[in-house]
């Protein structure tokens, strides 16, 4: 069972629909007991970092997520969910994240139109069970104004270019992040979710 954490930050219906297509049983929840019982966790989200962290803390789920991560449970963060994994965001202030990954979030370069919205290609940075080894620059769907700006280089699986390097897929142990929306990224996005679920079994 996959627990999709619902802290009021969107894109859950399309994500659950994508998982249903893969015959993956998921529940949408804010209950600590259900999250702890799940085989894996997905932290989705769109919107502001500060608001998301406040909602997660009010639900007392920050410590639950951190504890489950420490136990080795697979956790996938999508879009804002991926950004919440990091230590810090400089989005309209200086905000503390979940600290599951080292690094920080900053606004995308002012030289390009923000938000970064629409289809963009992925540049594969290192081999992973998530990809076919012969994969050539697939297109995925992004919607974001902030991006990971500092990170551990060995966690970067794939990136995109939009005025700067955009970390698009990161992974460290049981923690995986996707800055784009796999559930909105066509056949490749569905294949990514499928391979992710196969990888964490």
UniProtKB/Swiss-Prot annotation:
Reaction(s) catalysed (UniProt annotation): 5-[(5-phospho-1-deoxy-D-ribulos-1-ylimino)methylamino]-1-(5-phospho-beta-D-ribosyl)imidazole-4-carboxamide + L-glutamine = D-erythro-1-(imidazol-4-yl)glycerol 3-phosphate + 5-amino-1-(5-phospho-beta-D-ribosyl)imidazole-4-carboxamide + L-glutamate + H(+); L-glutamine + H2O = L-glutamate + NH4(+)
Domain Glutamine amidotransferase type-1: 1-201
GO MF terms, alphabetically ordered: glutaminase activity; imidazoleglycerol-phosphate synthase activity; lyase activity
Keyword Cytoplasm: yes
CDD domains according to UniProt: GATase1_IGP_Synthase (cd01748)
Catalytic residues (UniProt): 79, 181, 183
Principal location: cytoplasm
One protein family per Pfam: GATase
Protein localization: Cytoplasm
GO cellular component: cytoplasm
Record-level GO BP terms: L-histidine biosynthetic process
Enzyme Commission identifier(s): 4.3.2.10, 3.5.1.2
Domain of life: Bacteria
Keywords: Amino-acid biosynthesis, Cytoplasm, Glutamine amidotransferase, Histidine biosynthesis, Hydrolase, Lyase
General function of this protein: IGPS catalyzes the conversion of PRFAR and glutamine to IGP, AICAR and glutamate. The HisH subunit catalyzes the hydrolysis of glutamine to glutamate and ammonia as part of the synthesis of IGP and AICAR. The resulting ammonia molecule is channeled to the active site of HisF.
Subunit structure: Heterodimer of HisH and HisF.
Classification via HAMAP family: HisH
Protein name: Imidazole glycerol phosphate synthase subunit HisH
Gene behind the chain: hisH
């Amino acid at each position: 069972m996959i627990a999709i954490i619902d802290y009021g930050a969107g894109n859950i219906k399309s994500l659950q629909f994508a998982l249903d297509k893969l015959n993956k049983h998921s529940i949408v929840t804010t209950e600590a007991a259900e999250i702890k019982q799940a085989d894996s966790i997905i932290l989705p989200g769109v919107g502001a970092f500060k608001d998301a962290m406040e909602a997660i803390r009010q639900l007392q789920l920050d410590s639950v997520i951190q504890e489950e991560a420490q136990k080795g449970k697979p956790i996938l963060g999508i879009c804002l969910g991926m950004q919440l994994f990091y230590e810090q965001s400089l989005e309209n202030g200086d905000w503390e994240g979940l600290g599951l990954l080292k690094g920080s979030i900053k606004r995308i370069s002012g030289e390009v139109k923000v938000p970064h919205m629409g289809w963009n290609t992925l540049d594969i940075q290192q081999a992973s069970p998530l990809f076919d080894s012969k994969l050539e620059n697939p297109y995925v769907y992004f919607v974001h104004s902030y991006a990971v700006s500092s990170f551990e280089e060995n966690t970067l699986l794939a990136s995109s270019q939009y005025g700067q390097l955009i970390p698009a897929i990161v992974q460290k142990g049981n923690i995986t992040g996707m800055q784009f929306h796999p559930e909105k990224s066509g056949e490749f996005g569905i294949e990514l979710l499928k391979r992710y679920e196969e990888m964490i079994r």
